[in-house]
Design a protein with these regions (language model features):
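Carbohydrate transferase catalytic cores enriched for Leloir-type hexosyltransferases
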Residues: 1-240
């Protein structure tokens, strides 16, 4: 069976979705009847995809004639089959919610949460309209939905009316590769001391950080915990 992995989230400014995609992809090996390959867009070869995908041991097919953003904007109006851009596969896995139109073979979409339905006010309006349309199509087109927690599975089942048996949970986890010296340097530079509670993720409203800070302050006041609260992550939408 030929399995194609959409590795676009690994490229550019790698977010949590990019880390999830990268860590899963680099642990997949061809064999036992499975033949893995990765698909990425790199318009005119402008991006350093080779470095971004280092450690992923599978053939990488690169589409250089069209930018990914351009493809996303036109794919509902211009009938460009995905297989016109990449070789066909028996199974295609899309790690960023969306399955492109006109996919041949079976498809899996990874849907991480239902933020766009539960908390639409935390999202950019133009993105929200596109996500509503694209996720509805993707969920209907996919043969399986993968998500990252039992909570998200229940949400997808409840809000999108997806049968539970169609949804699989594959948990996410960080790759811990830093050396002890790196931790010590960061602790000294930022004034971090043990014990501490650590949040890792994009710093933006939809991560519910205000509630986290409120809960932490309550713990400090009522339970007298000695911990610091450490927030680690890049800036996102409306970080300010």
């Amino acid at each position: 069976m030929k399995v194609a992995l959409e590795l676009q989230p690994c490229c550019g400014n790698r977010s949590g979705i990019g880390m999830y995609t990268y860590e899963l992809a680099r642990r997949m090996r061809s064999g036992d009847g499975l033949e893995f390959a990765g698909n990425v867009f790199n318009f005119l070869g402008r991006n350093d995809n080779e470095n971004a995908l280092a450690g992923i041991e599978m053939p990488i097919r690169v589409q250089k004639t069209m930018p990914y953003g351009g493809y996303r904007r036109i794919w509902h109006r211009v009938p460009i089959p995905y297989q016109a851009l990449f070789p066909p596969a028996d199974l295609s896995v899309f790690f960023n919610f969306i399955v492109p139109p006109r996919i041949k073979g079976k498809a899996i979409a990874v849907v991480y949460d239902m933020t766009y339905l539960r908390y639409p006010e935390t999202m950019n309006e133009s993105n929200l309209r596109r996500i509503h349309r694209d996720i509805a199509y993707s969920v209907a087109r996919s043969d399986r939905i993968v998500t990252i927690s039992q909570f998200s599975k229940r949400e997808i089942h409840e809000l999108l009316q997806v049968p539970s048996e169609k949804i699989e949970v594959v948990y996410s986890a960080p790759s811990v590769t830093a050396e002890t010296a790196d931790f010590q340097m960061v602790q000294q530079r930022l004034g971090i001391r043990r014990p501490y509670l650590l949040y890792v993720g994009t710093i933006e409203p939809r991560k519910n950080l205000i509630r986290l800070i409120q809960a932490f302050n309550r713990l400090k006041k009522e339970a007298g915990i000695p911990h610091q609260l450490v927030l680690a992550g890049g800036g996102g939408w409306k970080t300010e």
